[in-house]
């Protein structure tokens, strides 16, 4: 779950 959140933020930034 955490990994998914990080990936989402990485896409935004």
Curated annotation (Swiss-Prot):
Tissue localization of expression: Expressed by the skin glands.
Protein's UniProt keywords contain Secreted: yes
Family as reported in the entry's similarity comment: Belongs to the grammistin family. Group 2 subfamily.
One BP term from GO: defense response to bacterium
Principal location class: secreted
GO terms, molecular function: toxin activity
A GO cellular component annotation in the UniProt record: extracellular region
Protein name: Grammistin Pp 1
Organism expressing this protein natively: Pogonoperca punctata
Cell location: Secreted
Coiled coil: none
Function of the protein: Has lytic and hemolytic activities. Its hemolytic activity is inhibited by phospholipids, but not by cholesterol. Has antibacterial activity with a broad spectrum against various species of bacteria including both Gram-positive and Gram-negative groups. Has ichthyotoxic activity.
Keywords: Antibiotic, Antimicrobial, Cytolysis, Hemolysis, Secreted, Toxin
Highest taxon in the source lineage: Eukaryota
Disulfide bridge positions per record: none
Subunit details: Exists as aggregates of 3-4 molecules.
């Amino acid at each position: 779950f955490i990994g998914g959140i990080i990936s989402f933020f990485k896409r935004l930034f």
